Amino acid sequence: MRGLGGSTETALRLGSDAKDRVYRAWDGFIDFAARDNVLEVALGLIIAQAFTSVVNSFVSDIVLPLVSLLPFIMRNMDEKFAILSKGPHYQEGYNTIEQARDDGALVLAYGVFLEKIVNFLGISLTLYTLAQLYMVFSKRKIIKRTVKCKYCRKWISERALRCVNCSSWQDGREDVQ
């Protein structure tokens, strides 16, 4: 019959191994999560989400109501729609997208699409302006100019000596025979 000493040793060894594995896993997680680029990306995503909600609010609450005052629009952009296929009770007409959809009509909601395009343009123009201001004040280039490779016609950095796609020299060495 086995004594308790052998199983106690095994239990202690297994417990020690498990503790070491937990410590290694925790250290690996800390190494991953505390790296500079992971924290920068996480912070950037959080700021980008907040920035996007501000621009979306600006577009939908300030810009689009002003655009809706134009004589040929005369309604909020998100309420603009076209009927592609009428529903069974169309004789009264549809005042809203919800009425048309409830009646079974096929609706093209182009106003919502136009609103999303204006949101995209607002976000991209604002980000471009912020990048330009950052470059002016920090003297660092974050928007890098690109040119097309003379040989493969792919976009590469204007400062590249060789194309990353086809490995050709950009200073004309390929042309000399």
Swiss-Prot record:
Keywords: Glycoprotein, Membrane, Transmembrane, Transmembrane helix
GO terms, molecular function: mechanosensitive monoatomic ion channel activity
Sugar-modified residues: N165
SUPFAM superfamilies the UniProt entry points to: Gated mechanosensitive channel (SSF81330)
Source species, domain of life: Eukaryota
Membrane topology note: Multi-pass membrane protein
Disulfide topology: none
Record's subcellular location: Membrane
InterPro entries: MSC/AndL, MscL_channel
Record field: transmembrane: 54-74, 117-137
Pathway info: Secondary metabolite biosynthesis; terpenoid biosynthesis
UniProt GO cellular component terms: membrane
Short name of one Pfam family: MscL
Gene Ontology BP annotations: terpenoid biosynthetic process
Biological role stated in the UniProt entry: Part of the gene cluster that mediates the biosynthesis of anditomin, a fungal meroterpenoid. The first step of the pathway is the synthesis of 3,5-dimethylorsellinic acid (DMOA) by the polyketide synthase andM. DMOA is then converted to the phthalide compound 5,7-dihydroxy-4,6-dimethylphthalide (DHDMP) by the cytochrome P450 monooxygenase andK, which is further prenylated by the prenyltransferase andD to yield farnesyl-DHDMP. Further epoxidation by the FAD-dependent monooxygenase andE leads to epoxyfarnesyl-DHDMP.
Protein name: Anditomin synthesis protein L
Organism of this sequence: Emericella variicolor
The organism's taxonomic lineage, starting at the top: Eukaryota, Fungi, Dikarya, Ascomycota, Pezizomycotina
Gene this protein is translated from: andL
